[in-house]
């Protein structure tokens, strides 16, 4: 037989403490201050030129990313100053009523510091040679670049006062299957 009384008391105290606005110690509150950074590579690009547009598939993937982020709170969207990254970032930024903010992919340590200091839930769109590197810098690991054929990774970095956790998601998106 399951004794339901302890759970009932726990639930009662949780509700009472929550509704009464009990002030927990400041250190406990600070540990709960959380923001999340999402890092993705730009979607499929047209050609090997310096600043190509997205392919039709890349446009579809960018719309799919927007749908993924519909239920995710974002306060900022960042992109490098290339058409392929801007094209990937814009659908999500527009759906959130945000402007795409630029960053320099050649200064990833500076970008990392600014993201941590900004303490905002944010999407950062980069490149195959910068996205994994930036994720690694954010969590203190050597992740490095990844192959140019990979477009389906979403790095999620959860930041609290005392910890930074990295989760890697793989999207199920396939071109032409919207």
Question: Where are the regions that the model predicts?
Answer:
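Short beta-strand segments
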Residues: 125-127
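Hydrophobic alpha-helical segments and their boundary regions
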Residues: 7-10, 47
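Noncatalytic modules at the cell exterior or secretory-pathway interfaces
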Residues: 121-123
